[in-house]
Amino acid sequence: MTLRFSILALLGAAFALLAGPALARCSQNLVQFGAGVQVASLEGFHFAADLSPNRVIVTFVGHSSFQIDTPQGVRAITDYNGVNGFGRKPDIVTMNNAHSTHFTDDPEEGITYVLNGWPSKPGETEAKHDVTLKDMKVWNVPTNARDWGGNSARINGNSIFIYAIADLCIAHLGHLHHRLTKEHLDELGRIDVLMVPIDGAYTMGMPLMVDVIKQIQPKVVLPMHYWGRGQLDRFEGLMAALDADFIWPDRRSVEIVKEQLPEKLTVIAVGGEGGG
């Protein structure tokens, strides 16, 4: 079963201007918020039976892995560690290598694109990807990562992966260890849905991660990389300062349509209380 949500309120001309070719890179945000996020009622936010041909289905697989299914049947898995999610194998997998739970050295044969988020070839200083398969375009923005063997940084050791589908821009922060620069934000462009690690330790402190959310200004946040209700409760408390709504669905999947994005910043805990 898939959790389907629909927003009755129209987003207005500003969001109409954001529309572009489905496979184009995400344009910059045209709506800028001040401190926090503009207040908008979620009255009318409900789970509906109507389907859109532009729906994108995002399913929480576990830990930092999400399965993304496009209208044309392309399937991607984020932070792929060898677990194929639900059903058939993916067409595209993206990986980061902060820990073994975020990648595999032995991906299943037949995956069309296997994209590492770190330099993995001799002489390579950063991973750079830009691939398109049917209605999904995927590229990455390299960021630094801590060297767990010491106090130094692994330059370009992590990647934020962006998935452009059906005029939606979805970003997965990977194992992010620092705030973003203007250059990072320019490369990211407009992000509608943001997958965010909220462990508060292995990646970065939770207040700092909330700062990153403020930098990116998504419409929807999907928490990941947490273990138990306590971390979610703390994250919910911090996000309250941004006047965000918090939704606890009873399923692992959410159906997202660009034209039905909420006006107000919304956190959807598709990983449930356990996360993983």
Q: Residues of each region from the PLM?
A:
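Positively charged n-region of N-terminal signal peptides that target proteins for export
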Residues: 1-5
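A Lys-centered signature of the CheY-like receiver
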Residues: 224
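Short, structured coil segments at secondary-structure junctions
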Residues: 89, 216-217
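Bacterial N-terminal signal peptides
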Residues: 8-18
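Active-site-proximal loop/helix segments of hydrolase catalytic cores
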Residues: 145-216, 227-234, 238
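Metallo-beta-lactamase
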Residues: 19-146, 168-173, 192-196, 229, ...
